[in-house]
Swiss-Prot record:
Gene Ontology molecular-function annotations: structural constituent of ribosome
Entries under PANTHER family matching the protein: 50S RIBOSOMAL PROTEIN L36, CHLOROPLASTIC, LARGE RIBOSOMAL SUBUNIT PROTEIN BL36C
InterPro entries: Ribosomal_bL36, Ribosomal_bL36_sp
Signal sequence residues: none
Keyword field: Ribonucleoprotein, Ribosomal protein
GO biological process, one term: translation
Listed SUPFAM superfamilies: Ribosomal protein L36
Claim: Ribosomal protein is one of the keywords in the record: yes
Family named by the database record: Belongs to the bacterial ribosomal protein bL36 family.
Protein name (database record): Large ribosomal subunit protein bL36
Highest taxon, organism lineage: Bacteria
Any single Pfam family the record assigns to this protein: Ribosomal_L36
Lineage summary: Bacteria, Pseudomonadati, Myxococcota, Polyangia, Polyangiales
HAMAP family per record: Ribosomal_bL36
Length: 38
């Protein structure tokens, strides 16, 4: 899980999901998991 100020899709399989106001990226590739933290 990468925590970044700005999250972006890395590949075509990446999806942007909002959970409890937190923007996350979920993907088949575990290295592409991201969470937005300011």
């Amino acid at each position: 899980m990468k925590v970044r100020p700005s999250v972006k899709k890395i590949c075509d399989k990446c999806k942007v999901v909002r959970r409890r106001g937190v923007v996350r990226i979920i993907c088949e590739n575990p290295r592409h998991k991201q969470r937005q933290g300011n």
